[in-house]
Amino acid sequence: MATTIQNNFRIRRNFGKINKIAEIPNLIAIQKFSYDKFLQADVPPEKRDDTGLQGVFKSVFPIKDFNETSSLEFVSYHLEKPKYDVDECHQRGMTYSAPIKVVVRLVVWDKDEETGAQSIRDVKEQEVYFGEIPLMTENGTFIINGTERVVVSQLHRSPGAFFDHDKGKSHSSGKLLYNARIIPYRGSWIDFEFDHKDILYVRIDRRRKLPATVLLRALGATPDTAKKDPVEFHGSAEEILKYYYDTETIRIEGKGKYEKDLVPDLLKGQRATRDIRDPKSNEVIVKKNRKYTESAIKKLVAAKMKSLPVEPEEVYTKISAEDVVDETTGEVLLEVNEEVTEAKVEELRKRNINEFKVLFIDNLNILPALRDTLMQDKISTPEEAIMEIYRRLRPGDPPTPETATNLFVNLFFNAERYDLSKVGRLKLNYKFGIEEPLENTVLTKRDILEVVRFLIDLKNGKPNKDVDDIDHLGNRRVRAVGELLENQYRIGLVRMERAIKERMSLQEIETLMPHDLINAKPVTAVIKEFFGSSQLSQFMDQTNPLSEVTHKRRLSALGPGGLTRERAGFEVRDVHSTHYGRICPIETPEGPNIGLIASLSTYARVNEYGFVETPYRKVEKGRVTDEVTFYSALEEEKHIIAQANAPVDKKGNFTEAKVWCRKEGEYIYVRPDEVDLMDVSPNQLVSVAASLVPFLENDDANRALMGSNMQRQAVPLLRTQAPLVGTGIEAIVARDSGVTTVAKRDGVVQSVDASRIVVKADVPTSATDVANEVDIYNLIKYQRSNQNTCINQKPIVKPGERVKKGDVIADGPATEMGELALGQNVVVAFMPWQGYNFEDSILLSERLIKEDVFTSVHIEEFECVARDTKLGKEEITRDIPNVGEEALKDLDESGIIRIGAEVKPGDILVGKITPKGETQLSPEEKLLRAIFGEKAGDVRDSSLRVPPGVSGTVINAKVFSRKGVEKDERAKAIEEMEEAKLLKDQNDEIKIIQDSAFQKIRRLLLGKEVTARLVDDKGEQLLKKGDVLDDALLDTVPQRYWGEIAVAGDVQDLARKIIENFEEQKELVKLLFGEKIGRLKKGDELPPGVIKMVKVYVAIKRKLAVGDKMAGRHGNKGVVSRVLPEEDLPYLEDGTPVDIVLNPLGVPSRMNVGQILETHLGWAARNVGLRLQEMIEKEWGADPLRKKLKAAFAGTEGGPVGERLAALIEDVPEKELPKLVQKLRRGMHVATPVFDGAREDEMKALMEEGSATLQSILFDGRTGEPFDQDVTVGVMYMLKLHHLVDEKIHARSIGPYSLVTQQPLGGKAQFGGQRLGEMEVWAMEAYGAAYSLQEFLTVKSDDVVGRTRMYEAIVKGENTLESGLPESFNVLIKELQSLALDVELLETPEAQAAREAAERDLGGGPLGAPRGAVASGEKSSA
């Protein structure tokens, strides 16, 4: 234990009370799991599921030609090894991808003309190259053209059926119009909607609407999909009505006397039209005009009444449910859906027909909407219905029954054109309670009929039927990388399918092989486009480890098939009750994307259907168990869920009589035995970034949002420091982000230096096996991240230490001791100081700059490319025309700057010359040519120079040259260095394997007697017969002869076997490194036309400066306003000056009190460290130290975590105690988890341990007087954000001008000028600064002639300003002329002469042509 404490182990006192039941799942699992499921690379082809890539191939193949005489079938696919590894792709700007090979089979059929039977004529199988597919790196990113990208998961509307109403907005009456929509994963949408007259309409693909009954009738005409269909339905009016309405049978008892069957279910809520009496007792059961109540209906049933009398007027409004036919004549007396009239009933009575069926419509609970729709509908047969649908979808095409039926069947019942996906099928089954197999992903007749039934029930106001909430997470699902890519791949394959079909029919199929048919270009193009330019494939935010993790866990509602910013309303963006534990309610951007981009909560995961799930503990009979299960938003719906902090005793029983719970988004108090589930942990409802904020529960939500977002912008510092007040999740973020190096296997550290760690792993092997038991971890040194921050790893283990699998052995950027460390712990005071902290400004101590506390390293990459131009080849060289030796002093003979050179703006990094076109030479130039030879004239200097605002040290240079181009000295030197590094790794690996193998042989031979003499190659005796082998004797024999030593038994065979195995392993290692060295030596793949490319990396140290933005973790941000010398700052009683002075007014109105609590707790933690330090200095001895440590780390009430820490402190040997205390000299580390943090009494107790006070007396550093009031002083964790003043400051005198308007470009990147808008012009006018304004609007902007004159005037020493005509005036004239307005400029003769003279000087064209224009990007000096 002792060794771990002194090295890579951090003890934190945890204030959490709630036991950790479940571990936080791997933070980037959503990305890795999804992509693995898509590729299924490690699954043998025959065992692959039909999802991802396999699913796409299966759904598109087999491809048949148009006559179906041949088909191309898919057999299997496999991925080959990627050409370059991750590092090489980074350096060379390549894509990290693997070739994909597909085995396809071409089958040619013979068709018998008469019988139509098919027989196989020919089968050809072949493996075809199918392009490359990008692979995911270990950390869940993709490397595309050398940059790391992340594919963000998309949150979109799940496929299925959705019901809604228009909220009364469509019609002036404010009536609710209900609608339904069936959304497939791909295919046509169906919309059903009621209008204000209660007619039900349907739209297909948002075309013109038809009465819904047309679609229902058309279902009857679909050719037999009914084999799969669960309902018999032929689309007649009678069937439609009977499907949706109950029927009643009316009997004619005589003239004006009618009866109906008593159906108890239909009576409820109806009114009796006369007194209903019990036939036996004659007592009145239901009085006239009263409703049939449940008790009355029971009495009727008890009285065994079979029928009820019906009033004639009631009969005369009923609707017939079927055709009533006179059987003798075959005449239809009463048509289906016809209103029953007195005349019709009389007609029936005359014909002796005494009963008929009517629809049960009571206009209360059951409305005549569908019957009315059927009346509106003029179509009577399914065939006509299908023709009508065809006319709506393809207006202008004359339909035939065949084409119409084909179109209709393809729309919804053909798996190639319509796909609900498993999710859609699952949702339909769930919604309508049907049990269709999930594999059936097309619509069935029953689905459509049930959607209409549900919609009618909604309209009728049936209980338990409600409209859907579109923002419920049961109706939104996540499409992760795998699925997004699967959709893209399908698009590519479908494009390819068209081409294949055409080729199959055009060419002679017998002579073709599968590879002649397949061209993989469309597929690779689609994949390339997706990774390169899709809205969801984003440039990874690599500022610090937290921003990487958050980016990979992000959910976006934008993107293809999602919402757009403009259209998204308020509801979509809002927090929904189902977000609890699934999507973080805090972390979302401010601005137009608020609520559309969210982050997964800490414990959330995405299930196979794409729904977000969160874990809960099972509760049985009021006792909480440790069984954890994941629930999606729909599954959770009916459960009663207790909070994680509900008080529970040791056995898991709730201690209180009522428990505060959630049910369906509401909060309620319930008895313990009613609770079903309980939260796993209090921080399960927030995201990773939010759970890094201590005392989050004491911050206002808006500020918590800013705090979460700003942590992602923290720049990794040169000297990292984990927070004194953390939340206990820091180590998890550091481990899962992939920036630290984590041990792959248990083992012992063999050697450590700054750039690599060698671990000898524990590999259990048999006596003779030799395994590769070496893990070499090459650390990343000073690499540039996407955001120009510095990625650098440093080891935190020592040789001889034991490491376990999963231990952090090297820290990365912004981590310390395996914990996330985004900022620094500094002593802050909340007080005003001379107005320098007005409006959130921050006052700093010079110490922070002197000691590099907030210094960060940024790495800029500069690229120089030598191309083959029309005029000749560009050359990278040291020999540059017109450049003095001083400027070349740091370039080597190849023209590339040396590593370690300090550079400033304007310095040459890479010397390059470009051939110049031959121009007419002036006499002076001819003279120069004659004197100095050819060289100077025909080339110009196009060297790569350091841009303004960058000064630093060159840390690396890389040279890439085309195959077949002679490598220069620098390239050779770099190559040799790389090769030496690889060889060193290879030799170390072999050496460790060798040591371990011969250690085994040594164990076998020790103590054995030699049975035969051993001689070496020269015949000299090494061992004589009878020698007994011991260590000393063995060491005299060279290892290569150990296999030759003859001893009794089979030891010699075993020794030889070990040596053989060792040789085999050695060859494997050499082979692996040989491949890498081979790749180093061969030329690089460069873009066309490029001969050579040089990349130079410059490291810039940025110290904290006035104007930099800083922030705490609670949304308390500010800008540095002044840096004060230490002696002027307020200081404490012991003389310590504070580091930062913050404005106390920043706290009350913003309500982020968490920062004050953090300050207090940090102060207590720091003081405990100081007290311990004092105890060591005064040599108190081990026992009091131990006691103090226990009191500080384990607290008074202990708890399981406290007990563990107390035991740990007890185990530390006496002489190690000072080392442990030394580690706490800056303060002890504490963790206060979100929503389960330190309580006030605990904080006070810790304060007392460190004898600290909540407020301190401060003294003014300038006068030495104490301030009037006590000041809150403490330790706060402050971050330096990525908005650095050095990167934003920018100045220009002359630079590039825009081509058309001749005005300076804008922005720092283009080296542009400052915009002078109309408001600035008003300001100048207000001051009457006419001459300055004239200058601004002419020569400083776009007056080309004036610019030249100005230059001349300055040269001649005159100071007059003659402005010319601004170029934008010419642009305006041209604009007006393009609108066919004849506008011309009238000039006085003098002005014209002056203009023409200027044009001659400039060599410009006529008026309006861009004169002396410079393409944007090229600098023009006036």
From Swiss-Prot:
Pfam families: RNA_pol_Rpb2_1, RNA_pol_Rpb2_2, RNA_pol_Rpb2_3, RNA_pol_Rpb2_45, RNA_pol_Rpb2_6, RNA_pol_Rpb2_7. Its EC number is 2.7.7.6. It catalyses: RNA(n) + a ribonucleoside 5'-triphosphate = RNA(n+1) + diphosphate. CDD domains: RNA_pol_B_RPB2 (cd00653). One of its GO terms (biological process) is DNA-templated transcription. GO terms for cellular component: DNA-directed RNA polymerase complex. InterPro entries: DNA-dir_RNA_pol_bsu_ext_1_sf, DNA-dir_RNA_pol_bsu_external_1, DNA-dir_RNA_pol_su2, DNA-dir_RNAP_su2_dom, DNA-dir_RNAP_su2_hyb_sf, RNA_pol_bsu_bac, RNA_pol_bsu_CS, RNA_pol_bsu_protrusion. PROSITE patterns: RNA_POL_BETA. GO terms for molecular function: DNA binding; DNA-directed RNA polymerase activity; ribonucleoside binding. Signal peptide: none annotated. Keywords: DNA-directed RNA polymerase, Nucleotidyltransferase, Transcription, Transferase. It is an enzyme of class 2 (transferase). Residues 1392-1422 are annotated as: Disordered. The RNAP catalytic core consists of 2 alpha, 1 beta, 1 beta' and 1 omega subunit. When a sigma factor is associated with the core the holoenzyme is formed, which can initiate transcription. DNA-dependent RNA polymerase catalyzes the transcription of DNA into RNA using the four ribonucleoside triphosphates as substrates. Belongs to the RNA polymerase beta chain family. This is DNA-directed RNA polymerase subunit beta. The gene is rpoB.
